[in-house]
Amino acid sequence: MEEHHRRLHVKAERASVIGGDIVDGAFGSWALRAARSEHQLKQQSNEDLAQNARISALLGEMRPRMSAMPPNGHQQQYQPQLRRKANTTNIVDVSSQVPSARNAIYGSWQDRHRPTRLYGSQLVSSSSTLPKYDQLYCNTASPLTGNGSTNTIATTGIRREPPEYGNVGRSVSTWQVTNSEHRPSLQAGWLKSSRPLARGALSPAAYFRDLENRHGSGASSPIVGGLSVVAVPITQRHAPTAGLAPISDDISTSKVSLDTENQQLNNEDSDKISGSALSRNTPRQASFMAAMQRHPLKESSTSIESNGGGTNTEEDQTVSATSKEDPSEDTGHDDPEETQEISETPIRRSRNRNASLRNRQSSRSLGGLDFEKLRMGTARVGDSNEATAENGTSSSSSRKNSRDDGLTSSPTTVAGPVFTTSSTSSISTSGEASSTAVAAAAAGSVAATTSRQTSSNSSVDSNHNEAMKMIRRARPKSYVLATSASMNEDVLSSSIIANEQSSSISHDTTTSGRELPSSLMGSTISMEMRSGGASSATTTTTSNSGQQTSRSLNAPHPPATHRLQRFIALFNSSKTSDGSGEHKKSRMKRSRTSLPASRFALPGTILQRDGVARQTWVKHQEIALGKSGKRNNWEDRWAVLCRRSLYLCVESPAYTTEKTIELGSHTRVDVCNAIVDIAYDWLSSSFSKQRHVVRIVTQNRSEHLIELNTESEMLSWISVLQSSSEDGIATGSSVDENELSTTGRHNNNAVSNSSALLHNSQSIASLASSSCSTATTSEFLNSQHTLQQQQQQQTNQKHQQTVNELSAGIVSHLPTSKSFGGLSTTASSTTENAKNRLIMHRYIAKNSQLQSPTANKKMETDPSTVPSSSQTMATTSSSFHHHSSQAGPSRDIENGEAPTATATTPKSGRKWKKSKAAKQGSGGGSSGSSSGSQQQGAAGAPQPVLGVRIADCPTGSCEDHVPMIVQACVCVIETYGMDTVGIYRIPGNTAAVNALKESLSNRGFDSVDLSKVESLDPRWRDVNVVSSLLKMFLRKLPEPLLTDKLYPFFIDANRISTHHNRLHKLRNLLRKLPRPHYDTLRFLIVHLSEITKHSDVNKMECRNLALMFGPSIVRPSDDNMATMVTHMSDQCKIIETLIHYNLWMFDESSTTEDAVPEQHPADGQNPLEPGGYGVGVPTGVSAASFNDMHNLIRKANEDQAAAMMNEGKGQKIKNMLRRNSRRDKSKSKLKIESTAPAAVNPRGWTQPTPSNTSAASVESAFCGNYQERDIDAEIESRQTVSPQMTSGSADGASSTRLDQSPSLESSLGSLPDTSRTEPILGSSGYDDDEAKEAARRKRQEEMYSARRIFIAGAAGAAAAATTTADAEKAAIDALANHSQHLHLASSPAFEVLSEETREKIRRMQKKQSWHDTKELRSGELLKTYSPTKDLTDALSCTSDYSTTSSAPLSTNPPLAVACADQPNSSSDYASSDPSPCARNPSTSPASRPSNLAISPAQLHATSSSGQSHQPMSRSQKIRLRTKLGSRDPARRHTLSDVDTLKEGRLDKLARWFGIRKSSPDVSRDEVSDDEKNHQEAPPLPAAAPPVIVRTSPNELTPVSGDELL
């Protein structure tokens, strides 16, 4: 014994032990390498040196954080229930009689207080220095046929310096099994340890160094013997009753003879102690096992002892020879007296023998690997079978109860490497089976390890089950990640096991907790273990040749929570589950931290191009099966569908050829027998949020979501995936085709057809629920409809009934696996359950929760395009009916039938809210959309019609660029609306327009058959509704027809003065438009030109149409008020030009040399081209030009208008108007008389009269412009040429026409300033009372004639023409001729005042009385005429095209009407346009005269009896008092009503209303008492009217905006 320890000390010094982290079983290889002599190391090949370096790096990267532990003598005793089993270093002592052996160290060590790590010489500088590394020792005593036991002890491996931690993370090594040699691969990951390492009494390294120190110092203390190096992970449960320590050593194969002392100790303690080798449960064991196989020993019988002496070497060789000669000696020891047991630690001894210990370690152990046998391949299947037969019943019984979780001695054939557990460490080198191991890894190698136990099977089972319940707990996530790692490509090409033969592992179902999926076990053929019998079926597995990989390499592995499942997944080599044998269900424990299997990337692969069905970029996510709710963790993947596999790659293929495609790192989804359908829960009611998601549920119970870009792409992927899935069903059915009868094959095909029908019906139902109405969807529905009819004929009635029940949602009636031709495999049953339970139950239930409150409303669809419910049920076996009742509007409800199944809306459905996009409507959020357009069904997917670019709008054909909506609207209008008065001018009903818009959005243009308008929606026959829809479409375009880029060029081109240059420029710009814009514009302009050809009927001339379409077609995208104000005239003028010259503008064959068409008469007059404005219009007035007018307006008011619009908020403009009104009122203290010279001018003064030509030119220039409010009146006014306008008339009449022109005060610079003050010379004629009376009478006649014409219309003008006096007739005719175009009353449609109002006015006139007036004072009197500059400001200077000017400019326009004798100079309250154009007072109540006090019947009475009245003084001024007549309080005030209030006795009430006094501000002079008495007398019935003096027009500005009423 002393000699043994002396040699041990020498070996330790020679090895120069340097600190390093050696864990688990990997140190065995290092120990033997370190113990070799120097000359052996020098003779080692370069390959071995490279392997040493690789293993050294591996061990360094996998270093745990170990450190020294408390010094010797301070052993910490833990209770069994308080110890943590995992991550422990196993040291057991065989000599239980020795106290030091009983207190052997158990556990691995981690010092949490060590600040740094020591390396190199720091660890060996002193003999008392504790090593900073971990070593694994196992004290064992192995009997050798009664000759005693050998004890092998060795030092650990040497690594001079550790690798740097900062370069790479602590890697995880994974194994991949193919036909080449094992090679562990390093993956940067697993950056922290799985869990803290357990603390024990003393470090095994410290314990061993203490032994060395005591031996070297001559200590006489007892030495613990029986130490042997365990080079591999130790099996946790061995058969202690077998008497053999089943510890395999794949490297250290030689034995060192030991004294019989240890043998005796072991014999004495054999009945008391049942030992069990323990292992650390770290995820690195596979890495060290890989390292061990890469570094096998070349010498089987010479090991460490060759350096120390030859005695033990000879003994070892003798042992090996003995083992070869008698293989049955070590396999059949049943005598307990001859058995040797492994000593257990004091901690473990507190357990119930070794049963509880072994059960506590259940399903976590790793058997010893005899990799030398695997490498050499010396054993054969036949040898294993023969050895198994020799073992007998007792051996089989012990094998069954060994329970090594697939790593035991069961002589079964499974797909995986064989982990042999041998009783000795010797290995035969002659190629025969070892005497101690009857199993060897060869072609289809069979493992048989002889280990026995004497305890009863029942007690073992019960103890094991109890222990399994105690040890089940959740694994940390880091541990799951480490043990679930997949494999790399380099291992695929380099690994080999058992001479290119695959082997498997037997798995006992009684020792694990949960069922292991058959996809993990592959073609594992589990053996039926029978207690009491040694018979077991052994079957050789199919060998893999070439580079063929196993199923476990291509398919993702479910996460294993312990090493047994991981090794099963790593080493099974069968790919297909052919169902040739009965599978034995395996149970596995699931971890709560497990991840989806396909999350782990597989190495690259090469695919055949002919097998690739489809590939593109998709968004993918995998969710846990059965999880509810949406997740947005989408990942971009390159999807490649090849046969029955879907490859999801991170990057697109880097290298492709004509025949192959090389994929990089990817995940693989098996779509064989998968369920493919639309993900209904991702459907959205908003088009902008619509997602096209495909759901794939595979047979291994994983769920994948794939998002495509478009609907057509989604449908094509569904079709291809379903065909691939059905091909998988057909392939699975053909496996047992020889065993199936003709009837069975018929049933299988029928059910396959039914399954295909089920897929197709689900797709149709999803399409119907999504309300997709595009052409692609219609074609798909038709094709699927035809396909289902064909499949319906092929399916028999029995299976048809089954499919009907399934599609109707009856989950209780489910077919068995016999429906698929009698296949009873697990995959088939899983597929059947997934198809029936998952998609029919879960998805339909989820779809019912997605319904919106409007989902059950009637769906307005064309019955001719959608099949009825009865037809749908007949063709799709009621699946479409069921889905339509669940996911979308029910067709049965629409047809008046009661649905068979209704979906109840859960509470979540009550909280359903309309999205923002749905509230705004599909037309881009128009403000006029009704509530019907705001609500969209949750299952609907409306296609927007409005708010879409021209290029994206649906068209009739590929060559046609005109949108379908434009063609439809134009077709309807040209068919039914050419003779409609006011077409495009009169708007349609807003609700009807929105209804048409929604109909087109939901159903598209397929339901609009213009050839059968009678059968369409009645709203399509309303031309006003259709015209409004067309204008709305143009207004909602994101980019107008004349694009933003060319818009400023069009504006500049329109302002070119020369006619031919302007047309050429406009045509050149038109040809620069995009093709869709150009074609659509040409289509519209040609249509508008056709409208103008019927203008005599529809009253829509070119300029009227330009007013309607100019702001919609010619506009910028960012409509701002300043641009609209300044460019309004240009916009309308451009459209007018295009309509006039459409043939020349859109002639694509024309060139620049073509002659320009002559200028159209209505095209206007350019400033540089005087004359030619219109037929019969004289020339000479340059200010009448439209462009000149616009330029003047733009230059004067553009900046001011923009500034005012910016200040439009907060009533700033209103305050400005009030301030201006107060400022102007202070200037109105002077008496301002009327500007009507014929009425107020004295005889001594005559106003300068312009020429008739000038007057006519101005009148024709301004009075004949566009009038949006009254189309017919404007046409009549332009067509009527009065002879009094062109022929010379009286000077007074000419002055009246000129001065009272409504556009006079609004024309910039067209007339001189008429604000003047001239003295009125007194003459002796005024002293004559008769002259006074004549002047007064003449004025009254002119005034009353105008009122009579206004009230009575044409009849009043005819009556006025019959006046007896020639002068009166001439004056009345002049006044009537001037105002005739403003007071047309030929049509009742343009009569503003009703008969009731006229009657009220007549009654008021009859009640009115005139008072006597005093004579006018003689002398000079200053008469001030109304200044034109007060009215000619920015508010009234707007182009005659401006129909919708800015709000600030039109809020409070100044009033030009102030008195009764100026009826025609008023602006229009009812119009928001302060343009200089003439207004038709009959269309607006704002231009009512301020005094309607005299009826036409009083005219003759006044003129005939005028001489009898008392003469009135010239300066006499009185106030007119009228009584307030009864009015309808609900009617809005007109000027007549307002003036009545002002002139009555309710002055305070009028002021309370905020209405300034607009009646004649007549101040009384001092009146004598006689006159006062005379005034108080009863009024005369024919009293003369007073002299009215006009007030300042600026004083009449309303105080607030409410007075616009």
From Swiss-Prot:
Residues 353-365, 420-430, 530-552, 868-879, 928-941, 1301-1312, 1461-1476 have a biased composition (Low complexity). Residues 323-334, 1558-1575 have a biased composition (Basic and acidic residues). SMART domains: PH, RhoGAP. The record marks 985 as: Arginine finger. CDD domains: PH_ARHGAP21-like (cd01253), RhoGAP_ARHGAP21 (cd04395). Residues 728-745, 846-855, 1244-1257, 1278-1300, 1438-1453, 1480-1493, 1500-1515 have a biased composition (Polar residues). This is GTPase-activating protein pac-1. The gene is pac-1.
